[in-house]
């Protein structure tokens, strides 16, 4: 998905950049990830983004806590979709932290899925491996 790009666009190109520009913790705050995802699921992503702004202006949240809440809110739609469509499937989460950690954590905690994190060194090759597997399956189908 484009959630990582959406997150960066919001964090760096909106009024939220005041406390989020350049913030990129290796491991997000788990409680704030859950709170952001829950807020977006219950009230929508726009209200969750507004809540980040309110907390930025009137609360003592750290930049890392705001980052985590925002990340949870932005990833919520992907988590909800996989909750509906991912039952019974093996879910491997690649990429780099903090997104990899956040996705896997939210899939386990919010969606009840057994998501596994792929080490960054391995996930670098996951797209090529996946493309190869698709090509092999298509070739097999074509040849009967």
Question: Which residues make up each language-model segment?
Answer:
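Glycine-rich phosphate-binding/hydrolytic loop that grips phosphoryl groups
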Residues: 7, 11, 15, 73, ...
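Glycine-rich phosphate-binding loop plus the immediately following alpha-helix
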Residues: 1-39
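Structural alpha-beta junctions
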Residues: 108-118
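Short, surface-exposed connector motifs at secondary-structure boundaries
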Residues: 83-90, 113
């Amino acid at each position: 998905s484009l959630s990582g790009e959406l997150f960066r666009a919001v964090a760096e190109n909106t009024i939220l950049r005041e406390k989020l520009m350049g913030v990129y913790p290796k491991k997000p705050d788990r409680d704030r990830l859950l709170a952001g995802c829950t807020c977006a699921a219950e009230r929508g992503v726009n209200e969750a983004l507004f809540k980040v702004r309110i907390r930025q202006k009137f609360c003592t949240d750290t930049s890392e806590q705001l980052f985590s809440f925002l990340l949870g809110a932005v990833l919520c739609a992907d988590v909800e979709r996989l909750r509906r469509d991912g039952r019974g499937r093996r879910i491997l989460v690649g990429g780099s932290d903090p997104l990899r950690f956040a996705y896997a954590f939210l899939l386990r905690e919010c969606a009840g899925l057994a998501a596994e994190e792929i080490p960054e060194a391995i996930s670098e090759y996951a797209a090529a491996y996946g493309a190869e597997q698709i090509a092999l399956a298509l070739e097999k189908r074509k040849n009967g």
